Amino acid sequence: MVSASNVEAPRRQAILAAALTCFLRSGVTGTTIDAIHRESGASVGSIYHFFGSKEGVAAELYLDTLRDYFDTYLAALRSSRSSRAGIQGSVRAHLDWVVTHEARAKYLFHCQEFEVIEESLPAIARLREQFYHQANAWLAPHVEHGRIKSLSPRLCQALWMGPSIEYARLWLARSGDRFNILDAQTALARAAWDSVKGRAAR
């Protein structure tokens, strides 16, 4: 027997996918529930049932995207067999995710509209806290054994991921300047490792 949740999950995702198209085209403020209805084919009632409001759709899309990004990043860390592999693998995973999910990445990195941030602020804070807790759990043993420099976790993350995040932003914002972001994977991965590797690095 097909459960209601099995039926509703694809509907929710279809609405979110349609909303993403609308938001990237018109912005959250410039998008209406009716526009999402037309793009998705879902009834206005269904949209309100699942998300409560347009801002609710925008917030859920932001959280869903952030969750997927964090999961991809953490998976790269957990599957690594060394400190070097974890640092470099997570940089590569970040760039791969941005290319594979370009539309969602644009929304995640460039959506700063007040309605979205305000609606989802507590949930975003919880999600980020969980992410940093898990990333730091991977990081701590490598720091303890001298494989990664002893820095504050957030400073370490900034040195490690800052350049590749900024490069992704430049790629997502490109217009006439066409370039392949993946051409920089090796250079960015090496730079990340060089910036945080400790004396006992391997």
Predicted regions and their residues:
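Short helix-capping/turn signature of helix-turn-helix
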Residues: F51, H110-V116, G162
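Hydrophobic alpha-helical connector segments
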Residues: E60, L74-A103, C156-W160, L182-Q185
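Helix-turn-helix
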Residues: V2-S3, A14, C22-G56, E60
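Generic hydrophobic, amphipathic alpha-helix propensity
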Residues: R11-A19, I36, L61-T65, Y69, ...
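Helix-loop "lid/cap" segments that line or gate small-molecule binding pockets
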Residues: A76, R92-V99, F109-F114, A192-S195
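Amphipathic alpha-helical packing segments from all-alpha helical-bundle domains
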Residues: R67-D71, E118-H145, R154-A158
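N-terminal intrinsically disordered/low-complexity leader segments
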Residues: M1-P10, T21, A200-R202
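Hydrophobic/aromatic-rich alpha-helical bundle segments in the mid-to-C-terminal region
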Residues: A105-H110, L121, V143-A191, R199-R202
